Amino acid sequence: MSTLRVLHEKSELGKTTVYPKEYAPHLLLPIPRDLNRKTLNVNVSEPPPFYGYDLWNAYELSWLNEKGKPFAARGEFIIPATSSHLIESKSFKLYLNSFNNERFADAAAVSQTMKRDLSKRVNESVTVNFILHETEIPVAYSPKGSLLDVLDIAIDTYSPDPNLLSTSQETVTETLYSHLLKSNCPVTGQPDWGSIEIHYTGPKIDHVQLLKYIISYRNHEEFHEACVERFFMDILRHCRPQELTVQARYTRRGGLDINPYRSTNPTFSVQNHRSFRQ
């Protein structure tokens, strides 16, 4: 069964929204990661050829204490890339809103409930953090590397074409980034805007051709997580780096932003540095 068919049958995307009045964990819609990975010719009977996570920031998160007083926080959810499922974004939004009128002893009780529900849906332990005070909010940052967007190019390709990628014989270690990433929701067609950062060691990637490849996603319809995995696999196969990390930070929609990270390196630390567009 295709990803689109699963979504059309089960998702609230593109449908009239009815917001829950009470705690509703059943609203969470898990989607098998294998559905997309098969289209990338990834052997789904083995562990994926990358490590990483999907980091979600939730900006519309609230609940009641035992006296009925509302509390608000920013939520940070880290789902391992090795999990069997991802969570469909609108179902996540509705699930979070189901906490609005629920009473809890404290923030820890809320986060523990969310961790339990999410971990059950994706079949792996999900990390849940709450940011409760302004002093905990990370400042915006700029990647330490070369901005591709300053390059003057001509392009008329707006669907992913890995054949655009090319390399030279020189071996380098460098970080490249762009704010020109745009893809689209596969169900509603809504645009997804983001910034992408690529760090690698290997044959030097042609910067002009890489920017063209990034822009070629402009009319492509695929989820955030799937787009980043497509980026990763295309660069890995066509450019043959010894080391590769691809991460994207998408702008928020419905009070959520999604930030997938994929790497050949099994040792990494989760960094939630917000881009200036977030």
Curated annotation (Swiss-Prot):
Principal cellular location given in the protein's record: cytoplasm
Signal peptide: none
Localization in the cell: Cytoplasm
Annotated positions binding NADPH: 89-90, 253-254
Keywords, in A-Z order: Cytoplasm, NADP, Oxidoreductase, Queuosine biosynthesis
Composition-biased stretches (Polar residues): 261-278
Pathway the protein contributes to: tRNA modification; tRNA-queuosine biosynthesis
Domain of life (superkingdom): Bacteria
UniProt-annotated binding residues for substrate: 87-89, 224-225
GO molecular function: preQ1 synthase activity
Pfam family, one: QueF
Region described as Disordered: 255-278
Root EC class: oxidoreductase
Its EC number(s): 1.7.1.13
Catalyzed reactions: 7-aminomethyl-7-carbaguanine + 2 NADP(+) = 7-cyano-7-deazaguanine + 2 NADPH + 3 H(+)
Annotated active site: 185 (thioimide intermediate), 192 (proton donor)
GO cellular component terms attached to this protein's record: cytosol
GO BP, sorted A to Z: queuosine biosynthetic process; tRNA modification
Subunit details: Homodimer.
Biological function: Catalyzes the NADPH-dependent reduction of 7-cyano-7-deazaguanine (preQ0) to 7-aminomethyl-7-deazaguanine (preQ1).
Family according to the record: Belongs to the GTP cyclohydrolase I family. QueF type 2 subfamily.
Descriptive protein name: NADPH-dependent 7-cyano-7-deazaguanine reductase
